[in-house]
From Swiss-Prot:
It is a multi-pass membrane protein. GO terms for biological process: ATP synthesis coupled electron transport; photosynthesis, light reaction. HAMAP family: NDH1_NuoK. Pfam families: Oxidored_q2 (PF00420). It catalyses: a plastoquinone + NADH + (n+1) H(+)(in) = a plastoquinol + NAD(+) + n H(+)(out); a plastoquinone + NADPH + (n+1) H(+)(in) = a plastoquinol + NADP(+) + n H(+)(out). GO terms for molecular function: oxidoreductase activity, acting on NAD(P)H, quinone or similar compound as acceptor; quinone binding. The keyword Lipid biosynthesis does not apply. NDH-1 can be composed of about 15 different subunits; different subcomplexes with different compositions have been identified which probably have different functions. It is found in: Cellular thylakoid membrane. This is NAD(P)H-quinone oxidoreductase subunit 4L.
Amino acid sequence: MQLQYFLLIAAALFCIGVYGLVTSRNAVRVLMSIELMLNAVNLNLMAFSNYLDPQEIKGQMFTIFVITIAAAEAAVGLAIVLAIYRNRDTVDMEQFNLLKW
């Protein structure tokens, strides 16, 4: 397949993630939107790696690294959301400003 197809799909995924990030007030949906944006970046990394030098695996290695970091970020984010839900009985983003006190 051509590079343009992968770039269009990645751009669409990234735009959907940004839309979800901006419009959602639910913390779990915000985390899912961030993960969708990271997956769009991973798709770009894989596409450019395959397009520029198909014999090298640097892009694939970096993509696996980003997936690992995203999994850790999701685990920490969900742990924080779960702790706030236990204390406040809501996952509304407006209630997260209570972390300031």
